[in-house]
Amino acid sequence: FQRIPAANGLPPLLLDGAHNPHGLRAFETAIRDAGIQPAAVIFSCLADKDISDMLPFIRRIAGDAPLFVPTIQDNERAMNGEELAKLLAEGRGPAITQPTQRLSLALKETASFVPAEDADRHPVLLCGSLYLLGEFFNLHPQTLEQELV
């Protein structure tokens, strides 16, 4: 995974290309081993993925943290955020599962959930699709130039 510190109006982020059950399992293990408890999670994927095998991992990774589900833009294979949010919400109890039209909106929404103290242990996680990460870097190219932590 890649850490991006809070800057330019973005919350502290942890990015990972986990886009299948194997990748999500590895991501889950890595964040658990690092003692990371997400403040919020942004997840999206393509419609041709077998989402049923991915759902348990996303639910465990998010835990009680708010889960924001944008629709990946400019990709006809993208899964609709509202459909995906409905699937992810099942079994999450009162935890927030919120579809958003765009990644930029999800990033704004998640910032308010990051604690003022100990933000390094409570970043916003962004995962589920390499296309989602590509969209993030298109929106925020300056993050590619930052010194990575």
Model-derived segments and spans:
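Short, acidic/turn-prone active-site loops that include or flank metal/cofactor-
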Residues: 43-47, 71-76, 149
